[in-house]
């Protein structure tokens, strides 16, 4: 009887989710209640985790808790440490949940709410969550090896070396971009800097408490950490109000860049239980807490989505970013649905912490479900704003101008009527001097969150506090991806160096670890620092590559798992990774090609293509006599040239992995030839 009731409940959830999604898709009014989205997502994510992740875990991957994980076999107290699955979940979620799920969906909102909702919900359940889960599985069956090293083992030395170089390049770009977002959020913000700084001693206290004083007492240390975190947040507010204290905790962007480099270096070489894992777990409290409160607040307030279902900008003519809905919406949403960066964490720090194989389901699939929820909440924060206000915040200065009246006039001409007074009122309510062209997604999320709180409390004076709290939240949200990313990149560099000089590949060696970490931090730190002193240089040169390279990385990771499953003889099961791989690689190859096509009569394609931009800039250089303008054009030409070259390189790497994957899978299926042989570590039974 009880089993039948449970089955009926799941059937009801499926029907309810389908109805809510149908309402979102077919609604024709000017606005729609966000509750439809909340209910639809709750049903779809619950069904996906309960049934699809279970099917993958026990029918395809066949997880075995009697098989010892790398953390148990190689327990060294530093990198390989068996860790409670709640802590591991906290670490993994904190590490993967960077800027992407907050920024991508907000930018994609320029095309309307429906395309992003469908891609986030369906794409994450069938693609992104699967991607994180299966890569984590592959790594724990290969002694916690990195993605590049696994490609080398399963596809051959040459392919592995080329792929590792490409993956490392993508990784350094991603870390530098994430670090720059943190720098921009904390620059000249004593409240934000103080709170972020305090999470370090709090995390160390938690690590020592669990390691030496009260091992396995997760609830105790959770309560202690949460209370101290709340105290730090409130103390940060008073620090910012005291002129003397505020001056101590106020830093410019360049100083913060050096500090983040130092923090990334130290966090990467210290034992994982001492700082990285407890700090990520602590950050997860705030991340999940804020998102959870935001979901409850949305249910309570039930604000309408004011952004249209589909806007005229699906053709690629929008001011926020260039490119049509296919393929550039998928590239822009990025981490909210699927992210190659996650594959690096799933084959970096996390597989070295899992205490048993079944934990991979919650940690891999479950963490990505949570990140996808974050992406939807970010989309809601953008969608509940007046469309005119959304475009005022996210459109570049070159499109709307510097003056509020001019901006209001331009945006109204796009069909989203807004007055200068409405823009000024919002600017005043959040305590900023201007909200025009505050691109990047973070201010939009912060304003949306502040508006939801305002609707609950009914007092516009609270908006300034919650706006700045949200900016702080985003900085904490992203910094955890920087430290975990640096540690993961250190593993990748050691894998590469080990091919040249074997002792450098020894993960247990402190000297080798310090050397590899130094190379890693110098790699991403250079681009970060240059970006703080040159608004068109450093990481800003490589920023346009983030979306394409990140998704290309996800495609390569899915190909690896497909090869592994084919070698294991699980041909039908391999479709869980093969089908998403085909879709993601189709999207990324198409978008990559569009980024390097020559100049044409299509203005949208010209805005997207680096090669077309080089041709346009070259024509301008020939007509320019002003020395300052000439230097600016030459710098822009150089940036586009670098982006075009790297885009082609990343596509060639992905194409090489694709060709070899098809060959290996074909031989396994049609000829029963397994070469290179399956590289699983020998079975060791848990003692």
Predicted regions and their residues:
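Membrane-interface helix-loop-helix modules in multi-pass membrane proteins
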Residues: 22-28, 32-33, 80-142, 153-157, ...
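Loop-to-transmembrane helix boundary motifs in multi-pass membrane proteins
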Residues: 154-172, 366-373, 439-441, 460-470, ...
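Extracellular loop-to-transmembrane helix junctions
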Residues: 31-50, 108-138, 148, 193-203, ...
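Extracellular/periplasmic helix-exit of transmembrane alpha-helices
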Residues: 298-314, 369-447, 484, 529-537
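Flexible loop linkers connecting adjacent transmembrane helices
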Residues: 53-81, 107, 121, 130-159, ...
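Transmembrane helix-loop junctions in multi-pass membrane proteins
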Residues: 18-31, 102, 114, 172-188, ...
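Membrane-interface "cap" regions at the ends of multi-pass membrane proteins
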Residues: 1-14, 47-102, 284, 324, ...
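Membrane-interface loop-to-helix entry segments
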Residues: 35-43, 47-60, 166, 190-233, ...
């Amino acid at each position: 009887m009880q089993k039948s009731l449970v089955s009926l409940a799941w059937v009801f959830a499926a029907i309810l989710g389908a109805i809510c999604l149908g309402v979102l898709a077919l609604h024709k009014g000017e606005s729609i209640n966000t509750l439809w989205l909340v209910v639809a997502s709750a049903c779809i994510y619950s069904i996906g985790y309960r049934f699809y992740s279970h099917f993958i875990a026990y029918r395809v991957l066949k997880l075995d808790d009697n098989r010892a994980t790398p953390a148990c076999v190689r327990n060294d107290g530093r990198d390989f440490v068996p860790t409670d699955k709640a802590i591991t979940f906290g670490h993994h979620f904190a590490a993967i949940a960077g800027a992407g799920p907050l920024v991508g969906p907000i930018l994609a909102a320029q095309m309307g709410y429906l395309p992003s909702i469908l891609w986030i919900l369906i794409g994450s359940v069938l693609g992104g969550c699967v991607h994180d889960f299966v890569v984590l599985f592959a790594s724990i069956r290969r002694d916690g090896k990195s993605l590049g090293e696994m490609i080398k083992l399963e596809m051959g030395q040459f392919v592995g070396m080329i792929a590792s170089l490409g993956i490392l390049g993508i990784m350094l770009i991603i870390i530098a971009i994430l670090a720059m977002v943190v720098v921009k959020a904390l620059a000249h913000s004593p409240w934000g800097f103080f709170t972020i700084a305090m999470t370090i001693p709090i995390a160390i206290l938690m690590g020592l408490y669990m390691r030496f004083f009260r091992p396995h007492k997760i609830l105790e240390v959770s309560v202690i950490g949460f209370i101290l975190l709340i105290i730090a947040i409130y103390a940060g507010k008073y620090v910012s109000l005291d002129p003397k204290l505020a001056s101590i905790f106020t830093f410019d962007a360049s100083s913060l860049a050096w500090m983040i480099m130092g923090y990334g270096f130290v966090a990467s070489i210290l034992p994982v239980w001492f700082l990285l894992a407890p700090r990520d777990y602590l950050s997860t409290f705030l991340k999940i807490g804020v998102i959870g409160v935001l979901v409850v607040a949305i249910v309570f307030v039930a604000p309408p989505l004011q952004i249209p279902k589909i806007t005229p900008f699906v053709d690629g003519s929008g001011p926020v970013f260039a490119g049509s809905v296919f393929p550039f919406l998928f590239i822009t949403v990025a981490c909210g649905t699927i992210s190659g960066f996650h594959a690096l964490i799933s084959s970096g720090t996390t597989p070295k912490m899992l205490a048993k194989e079944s934990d991979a389901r919650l940690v891999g699939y479950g963490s990505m479900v949570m990140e996808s929820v974050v992406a939807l909440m970010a989309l809601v924060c953008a969608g509940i704003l007046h469309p005119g206000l959304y475009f005022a915040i996210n459109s570049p200065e070159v499109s709307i101008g510097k003056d509020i009246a001019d901006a209001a006039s331009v945006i109204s001409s796009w069909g989203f009527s807004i007055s200068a007074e409405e823009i000024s009122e919002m600017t005043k309510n959040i305590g900023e001097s201007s909200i025009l062209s505050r691109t990047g997604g973070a201010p939009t999320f912060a304003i949306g969150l502040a508006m939801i709180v305002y609707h609950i409390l009914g007092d516009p004076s609270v908006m300034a506090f919650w706006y700045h709290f949200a900016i702080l939240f985003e900085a904490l949200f992203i910094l955890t991806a920087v430290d975990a990313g640096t540690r993961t990149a250190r593993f990748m560099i050691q894998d590469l160096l080990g091919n040249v000089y074997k002792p450098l590949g020894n993960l247990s060696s402190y000297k080798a670890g310090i050397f590899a970490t130094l190379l890693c931090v110098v790699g991403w730190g250079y681009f970060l620092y240059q970006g703080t002193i040159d608004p068109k240089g450093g990481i800003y040169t490589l920023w346009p590559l983030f979306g394409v390279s990140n998704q290309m990385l996800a495609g390569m990771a899915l190909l690896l798992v497909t090869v592994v499953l084919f070698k294991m003889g699980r041909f039908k099961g391999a479709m869980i990774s093969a089908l998403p791989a085909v879709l993601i690689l189709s999207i990324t190859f198409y978008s990559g090609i569009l980024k390097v096509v020559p100049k044409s009569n299509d203005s949208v394609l010209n805005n997207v293509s680096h090669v077309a931009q080089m041709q346009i800039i070259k024509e301008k250089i020939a007509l320019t006599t002003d020395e300052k303008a000439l230097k600016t054009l030459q710098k822009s030409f150089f940036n586009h040239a670098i982006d075009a070259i790297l885009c082609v390189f990343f596509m060639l790497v992905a194409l090489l992995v694709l060709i070899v994957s098809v060959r290996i899978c074909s031989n396994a299926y049609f000829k029963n030839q397994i070469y290179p042989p399956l590289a699983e570590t020998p079975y060791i039974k848990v003692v």
